[in-house]
Amino acid sequence: MAFRGWRPPPPPLLLLLLWVTGQAAPVAGLGSDAELQIERRFVPDECPRTVRSGDFVRYHYVGTFPDGQKFDSSYDRDSTFNVFVGKGQLITGMDQALVGMCVNERRFVKIPPKLAYGNEGVSGVIPPNSVLHFDVLLMDIWNSEDQVQIHTYFKPPSCPRTIQVSDFVRYHYNGTFLDGTLFDSSHNRMKTYDTYVGIGWLIPGMDKGLLGMCVGEKRIITIPPFLAYGEDGDGKDIPGQASLVFDVALLDLHNPKDSISIENKVVPENCERISQSGDFLRYHYNGTLLDGTLFDSSYSRNRTFDTYIGQGYVIPGMDEGLLGVCIGEKRRIVVPPHLGYGEEGRGNIPGSAVLVFDIHVIDFHNPSDSISITSHYKPPDCSVLSKKGDYLKYHYNASLLDGTLLDSTWNLGKTYNIVLGSGQVVLGMDMGLREMCVGEKRTVIIPPHLGYGEAGVDGEVPGSAVLVFDIELLELVAGLPEGYMFIWNGEVSPNLFEEIDKDGNGEVLLEEFSEYIHAQVASGKGKLAPGFDAELIVKNMFTNQDRNGDGKVTAEEFKLKDQEAKHDEL
């Protein structure tokens, strides 16, 4: 509401209450019918202003003779009577009777003939020497010297910025006349009024009345008609010469020249790396409007918001605001609408809304990242280093970059055991355990593409999470050469088949084969690959020798590894 379109008022129209022939006679005589009588039938509790000579008023009235016969009424015309007081535009009695009235005050006025139409009357309407009774209700009052009146009844404790010329604002309002009659309300439309200030988009009084407001401030702006819709009104709901009262609550404020603003809330003391364009971030946020209204929160979904930055995956203001953050940092990012969701808005975000994001950076990485290894302790003798195929026993604590503990073997009371290079752990962990000696302690940081990827582990590891493992290697059993599951520690007997075939029937069954291999391992003559199921290894070795798959191995089928490279047995 409050569009431009006023013009200076023309000379007042003179209706019935003008004198007919010159000035009224001076006040004289005594008695109830000889003097002006005023009865104040209703006076409002609040009366910030009363009518003075020179003021312009709008009022309703009913005019009757002493016997009750009506001769005129503004209500019949469905329009107030609008006139200056004390400038000779009214009969003298009415000029005097209106002085001192409050808006919404009701007066019953008895005007003697000498202060009305005298001994001439008004032909066909008011007989000569008539006493006139007027029931008057004052609707509006203003003066040509008036300016916009501002009353602030709430101002937030913090007011970092106020409305300036050319700012764009979003506000709610109730628009009433001075008598309290509502003519318009943004609340009824459940939508703010959005406009530029000070560039002619509003009536002059509202342009002036909004200047200096803070977001969250509430003020009452009273505007005289010559700074509003003037003599003609708006042609719909606002009559001519009406003073307007706007009860305004400012929700939002920005300037088209604004960029984002950043307020650092918490910055970790140790910040080894800051985010750059192309990084992938995981962060929590609360998204609010400038007035504090929450429109979205990652916390309510119990899941971080995960995205690349600097590549257009998020609104431009967030793309910029997330650059240069540390892991664990908390900051507030204020995004003007032209760097947010623009004039259209999105979902429950209104158009032209300034957005406030309170973010907490959980982690970030770059797709080009490899693992990071920091060794905290190495024993004096650290000559035997882990390699592919070795069997390792180690303890670990697994956490996210923000310190959230995911898992711990210490809490479980047992080590984690793997064969290095066998695919038993994620690739980043496999890489991080290499070239480590027994007793060494190290921290391994694993980016998600070398960890559990975008999917994570349901209920355990978030998707796209960087993982931190604090590791202590407790035991290392050297593995076998690549491709071997069993090796001899010494010379191989030339009569190997005969030694396995104890019953000498020319064929070896699985039971005989398994018993022999385990005996060689027990005596130290042979070695099975550590970390694997021994029975499965032996069975696999036997199956490889059983060429025709009949469940037994003959001398013709039996061959050593170096005799046929494609098999991993013996």
From Swiss-Prot:
Residues 488-523, 533-568 form the EF-hand domain. Phosphorylated. A motif (Prevents secretion from ER) lies at residues 567-570. Inhibited by FK506. Residues 1-24 form the signal peptide. One of its GO terms (biological process) is protein folding. GO terms for cellular component: endoplasmic reticulum. This is Peptidyl-prolyl cis-trans isomerase FKBP9. PPIases accelerate the folding of proteins during protein synthesis. Ca(2+) 1 binds at residues 501, 503, 505, 507, 512. Glycans are attached at residues 174, 286, 302, 397. Its EC number is 5.2.1.8. Ca(2+) 2 binds at residues 546, 548, 550, 552, 557. It is an enzyme of class 5 (isomerase). One of its GO terms (molecular function) is peptidyl-prolyl cis-trans isomerase activity. It catalyses: [protein]-peptidylproline (omega=180) = [protein]-peptidylproline (omega=0). Pfam families: FKBP_C. Keywords: Calcium, Endoplasmic reticulum, Glycoprotein, Isomerase, Metal-binding, Phosphoprotein, Repeat, Rotamase, Signal. Residues 54-142, 166-254, 278-365, 389-477 form the PPIase FKBP-type domain. It comes from the Eukaryota. SUPFAM superfamilies: EF-hand, FKBP-like. It is found in: Endoplasmic reticulum. It comes from Homo sapiens (Human).
